[in-house]
Structure formats: structure tokens, C-alpha cells
UniProtKB/Swiss-Prot annotation:
Family: Belongs to the Maf family. YhdE subfamily.
Broad class of where this protein is predominantly found: cytoplasm
Active site: 70 (proton acceptor)
HAMAP family (UniProt xref): Maf
Site (Important for substrate specificity): residue numbering on this chain: 11, 71, 155
Function text: Nucleoside triphosphate pyrophosphatase that hydrolyzes dTTP and UTP. May have a dual role in cell division arrest and in preventing the incorporation of modified nucleotides into cellular nucleic acids.
Protein name from the UniProt record: dTTP/UTP pyrophosphatase
UniProt-listed Enzyme Commission number(s): 3.6.1.9
Keyword field: Cytoplasm, Hydrolase, Nucleotide metabolism
One Pfam assignment: Maf
Cofactor: a divalent metal cation
NCBIfam families according to UniProt: maf, PRK00078.1
MF term (GO), any: dTTP diphosphatase activity
Length: 188
């Protein structure tokens, strides 16, 4: 059966290729602003991932396995999205430096042939070291933080700020592979 990744993220595409050799990418145009955060970050990321997957399911005219995910960075139970601009990136990174924060991913797998849907979420604790303002500004100049939740990419230059990680590394990148592997086995 065809496998579809409902994501434009090159990071998710690269990660999924470690589990599945052949899959299609169909970018979901689900409006994430329709999902209202009501206090549970687990529920929030699962609801967005479900919205993305259902958006693709409703367009298909053949059976498929659909995979979608959403990842957010949180500190003090506040969601840190992608920065609006360089100043916002600076403020986000500054708020993370020297502190622990949590990265949550919601993952949804749909088997349209069986009309089955599995939703899971995972959190990973990340601790940043102390970072000088100059280091933050140099990092922002690379452009890397501008399209990432929490304004950093652990798999890129932003990884140098990480002092400690507790949990799934791939969750922080955007697709928790171990969790997804078991979800795919369960839904077959």
C-alpha cells in the first residue's frame, strides 16, 4: 500500500526515509490556526497532526498509509513557535539559554483501507547551556533558526547550544522514529 508523508519538512522526509524506502510526499494545507490551545500540549500537537493527516485523507481516491506530525517547543508551558523575525529569534533563544525546555511532537498514522487512525505524542527534555548575546546573533546570521520551532535546529548549528537531552533525539528534530516504527507495525 502507498505510504504518504503529509509534510513539506525536508527534515521529516529525510528521517522517514530511514524507516521507509519508498513514500510520497503530499503537503497538507490544513490551517493550523483552527486548532485552539486549551492547556494540554500533548492534545494540541496531536490535534494539529490529525488535521494535517485528515486534510490529505479527504483528497485521496485510493487507499494509503498517511503519516503526519507536528512539533512544538515549550518553556514554562508556553508554546514557542517559529520566530516571526530575527528579533523574535533572538528573544526565543535568549529565553531558552541556561534552562530546560520541552519539545513535543504529535504523530498520526492513518490506514485508510482499514479506516484506522493512531495518534501518539512524545516529549523530550532539552537543556541549553549559557549562551552569550554575540553567539546568539552569530547563529541568527546563519538563517537556520528562522524556520524552526523554538528558533533552533538540534541537527544543525543550533545543536552546539544543547548541554543535555533526555528522551528521543529524533523527536526534537521533528519525527520520533522509534515511536513511529511501532505505530506503523500496529496499523498494518
Amino acid at each position: 500500500m502507498k505510504v504518504i508523508l503529509a509534510s513539506a519538512s525536508e527534515r521529516r522526509q529525510e528521517l522517514l526515509s530511514r524507516l521507509i524506502k519508498t513514500f510520497d510526499v503530499i503537503v497538507s494545507n490544513f490551517d493550523e490556526s483552527k486548532v485552539i490551545f486549551e492547556g494540554s500540549i500533548d492534545r494540541y500537537v496531536k490535534d494539529i497532526a490529525l488535521g494535517k493527516a485528515m486534510n490529505i485523507k479527504n483528497k485521496l481516491d485510493e487507499d494509503a498509509i498517511i503519516i503526519s506530525a507536528d512539533t512544538v517547543v515549550t518553556i514554562d508551558n508556553m508554546i514557542l513557535g517559529k520566530p516571526r523575525d530575527e528579533e523574535d529569534a533572538f528573544n526565543i533563544i535568549k529565553s531558552l539559554q541556561g534552562r530546560k525546555h520541552l519539545v513535543y511532537s504529535g504523530v498520526v498514522v492513518i490506514n485508510t483501507a482499514k479506516n484506522l487512525t493512531i495518534q501518539e505524542s512524545l516529549s523530550t527534555e532539552v537543556t541549553f547551556s549559557e549562551i552569550s548575546d554575540d553567539e546568539i546573533l552569530e547563529y541568527i546570521k546563519t538563517g537556520e533558526p528562522l524556520d524552526k520551532a523554538g528558533a533552533y535546529g538540534i541537527q544543525g548549528i543550533g545543536g552546539i547550544f544543547v548541554e543535555e537531552i533526555r528522551g528521543c533525539y529524533y523527536n526534537v528534530v521533528g519525527l520520533p522514529l522509534n515511536k513511529l516504527k511501532f505505530m506503523l507495525k500496529e496499523i498494518q
